[in-house]
């Protein structure tokens, strides 16, 4: 099916272009969301008459997205989750969780604007891409940790997945030489 794009769609085309797409993509996504019109003579004339208002509306949306992007770009957010000693989460951090964290900070971002290839399943610092507008993409950093204190340590660059990092190094721990002394058992060094 041929459609006229009413806004820029990534990997498809710019506003005003007539592109050929699969019927299901047009019927289920582009047409219901108002991102495109069927390509026929009446709709082409309608698009040309409304082009100025569509471009103004698109420019307004882009400027709003750019304002949010200027505030969010490169910012770090802390996500506290339960995890095992190896740093493996007992669940995962998905796009829904990213939206909740951003909403708690006062940013209204939709789930479809968060681009995670796979859910986050380990503690650490993770980059997350947000597409606020077809022409505005930014990256934020998620600091996934077991607690706020661990998040601070992680932000400083400490490794938190080893047992020593979690529990600390015990200086008073017993060593094997404390239990076994070859001289005390009456063995010569040659026999041992």
Swiss-Prot record:
- Paired cysteines (S-S): none
Query: GO annotations under biological process?
Result: translation
Which parts of the sequence are annotated with region: Disordered? 173-192
Decide whether keyword Nucleus is in the record: no
> What is a single molecular function from GO for this protein?
rRNA binding
Task: State the UniProt keywords alphabetically.
Answer: Ribonucleoprotein, Ribosomal protein, RNA-binding, rRNA-binding
Q: Which GO terms describe its cellular component?
A: ribonucleoprotein complex; ribosome
Stored SUPFAM superfamilies:
L9 N-domain-like (SSF55658), Ribosomal protein L9 C-domain (SSF55653)
Q: Where is the composition biased (Acidic residues)?
A: 179-192
Q: What does this protein do?
A: Binds to the 23S rRNA.
What family classification does the UniProt entry report for this protein?
Belongs to the bacterial ribosomal protein bL9 family.
Put simply, this protein is called: Large ribosomal subunit protein bL9
**Gene this chain is encoded by:** rplI
């Amino acid at each position: 099916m041929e459609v006229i794009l009413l806004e820029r769609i990534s990997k498809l085309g710019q506003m005003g272009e007539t592109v050929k797409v699969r019927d299901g993509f047009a019927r289920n996504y582009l047409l219901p969301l108002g991102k495109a019109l069927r390509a026929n003579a009446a709709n082409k004339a309608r698009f040309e008459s409304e082009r100025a208002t569509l471009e103004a509306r698109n420019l307004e949306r882009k400027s709003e997205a750019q304002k949010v992007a200027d505030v969010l770009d490169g910012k770090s957010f802390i996500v506290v989750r339960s995890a095992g000693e190896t740093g493996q989460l007992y669940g995962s951090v998905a796009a829904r969780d990213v939206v909740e964290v951003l909403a708690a900070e006062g940013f209204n971002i939709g789930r479809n604007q968060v681009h995670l290839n796979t859910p986050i399943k380990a503690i650490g610092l993770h980059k997350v891409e947000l597409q606020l507008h077809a022409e505005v993409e930014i990256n934020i950093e998620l600091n996934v940790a077991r607690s706020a204190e661990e998040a601070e340590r992680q932000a400083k660059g400490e490794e938190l997945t080893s047992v020593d990092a979690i529990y600390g190094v015990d200086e008073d721990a017993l060593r094997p030489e404390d239990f076994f002394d070859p001289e005390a058992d009456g063995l010569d060094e040659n026999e041992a």
